[in-house]
Amino acid sequence: MAELACFCYPHLENDSYKFIPFNNLAIKAMLTAKVDKKDMDKFYDSIIYGIAPPPQFKKRYNTNDNSRGMNFETIMFTKVAMLICEALNSLKVTQANVSNVLSRVVSIRHLENLVIRKENPQDILFHSKDLLLKSTLIAIGQSKEIETTITAEGGEIVFQNAAFTMWKLTYLEHQLMPILDQNFIEYKVTLNEDKPISDVHVKELVAELRWQYNKFAVITHGKGHYRIVKYSSVANHADRVYATFKSNVKTGVNNDFNLLDQRIIWQNWYAFTSTMKQGNTLDVCKRLLFQKMKPEKNPFKGLSTDRKMDEVSQVGV
């Protein structure tokens, strides 16, 4: 995750801003600079290579002292920065909202996946600039639309019905922030269309998840899609979701956290996010993740979670 201000800077033209991507030499100069504390939140002028991000975002970049940041000296960084600028330049961003726009925290891996989709001749985003723009605006939080199947970050499709598409996510070969853990497995479920869904199609998805992915928890980050994650990673997701939610509340970002369909979401996660939305502390909310919940009535007749041991899915073992 990183703020949009880590990729580009605003240049005032008439009454609105044009956004320009950073080059990696300007960022390198900023990373070596000694800057007064009062100037940490200001864009840095490298003198030679142009404008660089505010020094307060140093930890967002991979350096000898910080391996957890993004690899900004890659071609992919430039591609992602240009993708962001193209999207922002399609909007009218004024003095009144430029700060809120650039402080928006976005998913670096999601944006890299959009670049990968854009460069794939078999993908619809390769052929449609309008769809690419729409997908990018959703990814950077500048659209009220949710991420649906056609605007999704992409991945390998492992399940699809009339209402849902399930993607296997892999970041092993990413350039900006690869996940090098060979055991990493995560999935995302997107709605094919943002409209009411019949119980039949919900039941098909729930059956698939309980049958094939019973070693995973179904959660949401509040953005209109489902995530299927290992139970061992749930606490980490909770920390991230809570931090993002609080950050958005603090900065005044419109954050209508979408709890999604309670019949699909893991019961403990639904309790966690509902309590978070009520303004409770992280400790209070996370306690619900490890609490034994009273089993809910099965909303789908004939659909059981009871399986013989030899029938249990091996996905995620």
Curated annotation (Swiss-Prot):
Subcellular location: Host cytoplasm
Protein name: Non-structural protein 2
One annotated GO biological process: viral genome replication
GO CC annotation terms, alphabetical: host cell cytoplasm
Protein task: Participates in replication and packaging of the viral genome. Plays a crucial role, together with NSP5, in the formation of virus factories (viroplasms), which are large inclusions in the host cytoplasm where replication intermediates are assembled and viral RNA replication takes place. Displays ssRNA binding, NTPase, RNA triphosphatase (RTPase) and ATP-independent helix-unwinding activities. The unwinding activity may prepare and organize plus-strand RNAs for packaging and replication by removing interfering secondary structures.
HAMAP family: ROTA_NSP2
List of catalytic residues: H225
Cofactor(s) listed in the protein's UniProt record: Mg(2+)
Assembly information from the UniProt record: Homooctamer. Interacts with VP1; this interaction is weak. Interacts with NSP5; this interaction leads to up-regulation of NSP5 phosphorylation and formation of viral factories. Interacts with host DCP1A, DCP1B, DDX6, EDC4 and EIF2S1/eIF2-alpha; these interactions are probably part of the sequestration of some host SGs and PBs proteins in viral factories.
Family, similarity comment: Belongs to the rotavirus NSP2 family.
Taxonomic lineage of the native organism: Viruses, Riboviria, Orthornavirae, Duplornaviricota, Resentoviricetes
A Pfam family this chain is assigned to: Rota_NS35_N
EC number of this enzyme: 3.6.4.-
Keywords, ordered alphabetically: ATP-binding, Host cytoplasm, Hydrolase, Magnesium, Metal-binding, Nucleotide-binding, RNA-binding
Major localisation: host cell
GO MF annotations, alphabetized: ATP binding; metal ion binding; nucleoside diphosphate kinase activity; ribonucleoside triphosphate phosphatase activity; RNA binding
Keyword Hydrolase: yes
